[in-house]
Structure formats: structure tokens, C-alpha cells
Amino acid sequence: MLADSYLIKFVLRQLQVQQDGDAQHLLMVFLGLLALVTLLQWLVRNYRELRKLPPGPWGLPVIGYLLFMGSEKHTRFMELAKQYGSLFSTRLGSQLTVVMSDYKMIRECFRREEFTGRPDTPFMQTLNGYGIINSTGKLWKDQRRFLHDKLRQFGMTYMGNGKQQMQKRIMTEVHEFIGHLHASDGQPVDMSPVISVAVSNVICSLMMSTRFSIDDPKFRRFNFLIEEGMRLFGEIHTVDYIPTMQCFPSISTAKNKIAQNRAEMQRFYQDVIDDHKRSFDPNNIRDLVDFYLCEIEKAKAEGTDAELFDGKNHEEQLVQVIIDLFSAGMETIKTTLLWINVFMLRNPKEMRRVQDELDQVVGRHRLPTIEDLQYLPITESTILESMRRSSIVPLATTHSPTRDVELNGYTIPAGSHVIPLINSVHMDPNLWEKPEEFRPSRFIDTEGKVRKPEYFIPFGVGRRMCLGDVLARMELFLFFASFMHCFDIALPEGQPLPSLKGNVGATITPESFKVCLKRRPLGPTAADPHHMRNVGAN
């Protein structure tokens, strides 16, 4: 500071005696010297911290490395990992970002309590700490424990009677799904909305005993809000790194639209909650909303309602949990099923292998069930390989250490953004032979059984791994296996194969495409789509 003061006094004295031209020149020199001194002071002050951080590119002042990231952040991170190693850091805007691409490191870190935090960003602040995906601390721990227990009671487990209960919910929608596709009668069909309504109804049944038809305007609006939200989130994500960009007109417009969409979704869910409250019977728990209402009533009776949900508004918390579970569950399952179709179109021999296995094991008089899964290694491995190759959430969700953490001789500061590079793990040639190839056999061992290596992590790892992984696996198997059992798929004449590049937003989605379906008739009982709908509804 003494140097700064001396320079200022020196320049002021000179400005008093020099002509305007000389004064401007001296001012430029002064500003340059001041900037240099400030930089030197910053370097001295931060030398120890910089030395302890993982290596990585510095980037530019204010914006950091953002300018060099491009539109596909996961791809750029993979390139940087090759240059700086499996643990590197950089600044994206004002945020220190630490990226991990080694699966052992990811597993080790995300099992630790201190890595369960979420970064404090403008997007997170709009949620006010509500929900399950972006909540932290005691609220997150209590909610995860509660949801894990209640979802298991509804059948999100491969063990016991609950499995049959969940399978019944899913198969109700599988029958509707197959019946609707039968109606396409070989004409080109966009499967995205058909899959959306089927997957949505599984989640709606579980959470609030509600289902939609594909022509329901409320469902169409609902689905649009989710898809638009995913797209808008990708557009404004930069604000999390440079908060001052919130004042940009385009960012402000997108943020306002997100707020409007969230408010509309909240009103819909609040109506559902109000309907449940009017018909609530603690002796007849119908769904997840009822479980929450039961928990709220119990807390009121015990006089602990002020502490419930860590003091947050009860119904706001319930609404955000529903939004979290619905958005995460519907979008990811739908996108994965679409990618599986892309891979089947691009690899017809693999599709035929799946169908031959289903014909041999299941037969031609019924649809596959969860009990068949253990006897269908080709079908299961095809699903797993599709998940590996697409890696629809390539960066998973961002974590943030709750305190400074020492890792591999480096310091990961509290509050920094920690990103697990899932796509890099799934495309690592040191782990997977020719990872660019679609090869389901990589998941089958020498005994013909499915083997999932520990570095296959599509649902994340550790304390914050996906709550719905069991439901997701069941849905993917039952929908895909039933679809393959009932149809051959092909592109409409003259249409190119869908690209593997995809569209990058909150998830990586395949480009829009249509398919032509040719029936693979089942026996007289299973072949009638009207009968299938009746069976599924029983």
C-alpha cells in the first residue's frame, strides 16, 4: 500500500506541472504500474493457495477459462484431463472448479461427508434450499433417509413383495405404451411423446396416484415446461460462474421464464396436495404425497412441526421434492430409452440378438417380466452399453466441499465446484476396449453372465448417488425388452441415421427422429393391445 500511495502522490505532482499530452502519457504509465503492483500483491498473497491447488489452465481475468470451454463443456474437460491429469482445477468466471476423471478418486471422495455439499450459485438460491437434489445439511440427510425408506415400501427394491408392486405399476404403462405404438400401423412415429407419457405415468402413480393420457392438454403443457426448463437451464448456466451476467437482457428474460414455469408447476402440484389433504386417510397411504402428509400430521401431533424439514415451509418442501423427483426421473429415463433406440437403429445385428434371446427365453405368448432379467444377459448388457455410450448426464451433479479437503497432496477449498467427469470414465480407453464402439458384450463375462465393473457409474456414486436407480433399472428393462419383443424398428425411407452427437443441455438428448415399426406378433392373448390395456389396469 505504501508503494501505491507513493505512486499516486508522484503522479499527482507531475500532473500539476505537465501539459495535457504529457499528463495523459503519465496517467497511462501510472495505471500500468498500479496494475502491475496490484498483480504482484495478489500473487504474493495467493501464492500458497495457488501452489496447493490441482494444476490446470489459468484463463483470463474475470471470466477465467469460460471463453475457451465451447458449447460442450464435458468434451473440453476431457481434453483438459488428458493435458493436466485426472485431477485438475480452473476458474470458470469467479468460481474455482475442480474436475475429477478417475473413477477411484470419484468413489473415494463422494463417499466422504465433506463432499455432500452443493455450490452456492444464483440458480441454487432461487430454490431457497428446498427439495432433495439441491438441498444440503440436515434437511438433505433427513429427506434422503425418509425418501429412501418410503420408496422402498412402494417397491423400489429387487427384494420381497415390493418388487411385484412396482412391476405392476410399470407394466400398466408398458401395456399402454405398446398399445399406442400398435396404432401407428407402420407409419413414421416420433417416439418421444409416447415414451414421455408412459414414463411420466409411472412416476405420477408412485408420487400422487395420477396418470395422463397422451392427448391430455395438461400433460402436454407439463411436458413442455420440463423440456423448456432443461433447455433454459443450459442457456443461463453461465450465470452460476459470472453472477453479474444476471443483468444481461437475454439472461434476465430466461430467468424470468424459468420462474414463471416453476410457478405454474408449483400451482399444479399444490392443487394435487390440496386434493390429497381433503381425502387423506392415515390408515390408507396411497402414494408419496400421503406419506408426506402423514409425516406432517405426526409432527404437529408431537409438537415438533416447527423443526420438521429443518424449519422450512412444509408444503413448499413437498412441492419441490415432487418437482425434483419428477423432473429427474422422467427426463433421464425418457432420454435413455431414446438413445437405446438410436443404438438399435445404428446396430441392427445387436437388435436382432436381443430379439432372438427374448424369443428363446420369454417365448412368443407374453411380455418379459423382472423375473426374466437374470436369464437375459444380452438384453441387459445392451441397456448397460447404451447407458455407458450415451452418458446422458456427463458431468453428473456438481458437489461442493463443506470444508477444505486435502486430496492427493492438493487442497480442495470449501465452496469450490467439484465436478465428476462421468463421460470421461465411461469413455476411458484404459478401462474400456475401443470405447467409441457400441459393444454390449463388454458387460458379459466368460460364463455368460452380466458383469458391471465398478467404473460403470451412470447413477453416480457415494452419499448423493441417484435415489431412483432401482426404479430406473426396472423401467429401462421392462420398457425396452417389451418394445423389442413386440416390434422391429427401422428408419423411414430416405432418412439418415440419427447422429451420436446429441443436443447438450441439462442432459444430452438425441436429435429428433422418427421410426417405422413392424409388429412382431405375440400369441393370441398378448397380441391384442386392448386386452393388454385391460390386463395392465387390473
From Swiss-Prot:
Could you say which enzyme class this protein belongs to? Answer: oxidoreductase
Ranges in coiled-coil conformation: none
* EC numbers: 1.14.-.-
Give the subcellular location. Endoplasmic reticulum membrane; Microsome membrane
Question: Which molecular function GO terms apply here?
Answer: heme binding; iron ion binding; oxidoreductase activity, acting on paired donors, with incorporation or reduction of molecular oxygen, reduced flavin or flavoprotein as one donor, and incorporation of one atom of oxygen; steroid hydroxylase activity
Gene Ontology, cellular component aspect: cytoplasm; endoplasmic reticulum membrane; intracellular membrane-bounded organelle
**Cross-referenced SUPFAM superfamilies, in alphabetical order?**
Cytochrome P450
Q: Which UniProt keywords apply?
A: Developmental protein, Endoplasmic reticulum, Heme, Iron, Membrane, Metal-binding, Microsome, Monooxygenase, Oxidoreductase, Transmembrane, Transmembrane helix
The Swiss-Prot or TrEMBL record lists the needed cofactor(s) as: heme
What is the protein's name according to its record? Cytochrome P450 18a1
The species this protein belongs to is: Drosophila melanogaster
Tell me the gene name: Cyp18a1
